[in-house]
Amino acid sequence: MALTLLGDEAGRACFAITRRQLHLGAHAGQWAIPGGRLEPGESPEAAALRELAEEVGVALDASAVLGRLDDFATRSGFVITPIVLWAERPVELVPNPQEVAHVYRVPLDVLEEPRVPELFSIPQSDRPVLSIPIEMLGTSIYAPTAAILFQLREVALYGRATRVAHYEQPKFAWR
């Protein structure tokens, strides 16, 4: 997963998030950070850089890698390795229409709003579901994406060592 930090026209620090195409088999229409499977012999960092270029047309090199957040095992059988990237220069986000319906720059300060994170329970699990309301998108983002964004907030913005693997995903994300 390419958790990419970049600027916007107003000079604010943002992260890039996509809305997946509706025709995709896995997680169609869901909100996601660019990412995908590792190619044989590929490191998570190389995969993040490749997927960022494939999904939103941003070509960065290895110097853009800031580090990793914790792996997140999903209910659908994937293990997400979040790689935090920094786009030092201005970049244009161009969604690949095969995979991405829309791509957005969301200011990092939305992660500091008082109601972030929101936690709720579901009957299928004893673990809390984590979500992050993002008003500019008109929706909430749910774990695993929300859990990873929450960890980014805690580690990068507040300097707190925070783990997120215990957060549950909503039932719709299990498939």
Describe every region a protein language model picked out.
Residues 65-82, 90-175:
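Nudix hydrolase/Nudix homology domain
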Residues 2, 52, 107:
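Terminal peptide-recognition signature
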Residues 1-16:
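Conserved N-terminal beta-strand and adjoining loop/helix that marks the start
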Residues 42-87:
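Hydrophobic, well-structured mid-protein blocks that either form specific transmembrane helices
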Residues 6-10, 21, 87-91, 108-109:
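Short loop segments at secondary-structure junctions
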Residues 12-54, 70, 132, 170:
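Conserved Nudix-box catalytic region and its N-terminal flanking loop in Nudix hydrolases
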